[in-house]
Amino acid sequence: MPQLVPFYWMNLLTTGIAAVSILLYLSATIILPNVLRLLVARAIIVRV
């Protein structure tokens, strides 16, 4: 199990931080604005 070998901790930590950072950036710049645009469009359609 590589999680228990201290040599791999830095690699796992770096990979984990990089993956979380990339996912957070993508969700904040691409996914969330599209969802917000869709919800606003639906709200406008329902009101009309």
From Swiss-Prot:
Lineage: Eukaryota, Fungi, Dikarya, Ascomycota, Saccharomycotina
Swiss-Prot/TrEMBL GO biological process terms: proton motive force-driven ATP synthesis
Ranges annotated as spanning the membrane: 12-32
GO cellular component, one term: mitochondrial membrane
Organism encoding this protein: Candida albicans (strain SC5314 / ATCC MYA-2876) (Yeast)
Protein location: Mitochondrion membrane
Family designation: Belongs to the ATPase protein 8 family.
Subunit structure: F-type ATPases have 2 components, CF(1) - the catalytic core - and CF(0) - the membrane proton channel.
Membrane topology note: Single-pass membrane protein
One of the record's GO molecular function terms: proton-transporting ATP synthase activity, rotational mechanism
Function: Mitochondrial membrane ATP synthase (F(1)F(0) ATP synthase or Complex V) produces ATP from ADP in the presence of a proton gradient across the membrane which is generated by electron transport complexes of the respiratory chain. F-type ATPases consist of two structural domains, F(1) - containing the extramembraneous catalytic core and F(0) - containing the membrane proton channel, linked together by a central stalk and a peripheral stalk. During catalysis, ATP synthesis in the catalytic domain of F(1) is coupled via a rotary mechanism of the central stalk subunits to proton translocation.
Name of the protein: ATP synthase protein 8
Keywords recorded for this protein, A-Z: ATP synthesis, CF(0), Hydrogen ion transport, Ion transport, Membrane, Mitochondrion, Transmembrane, Transmembrane helix, Transport
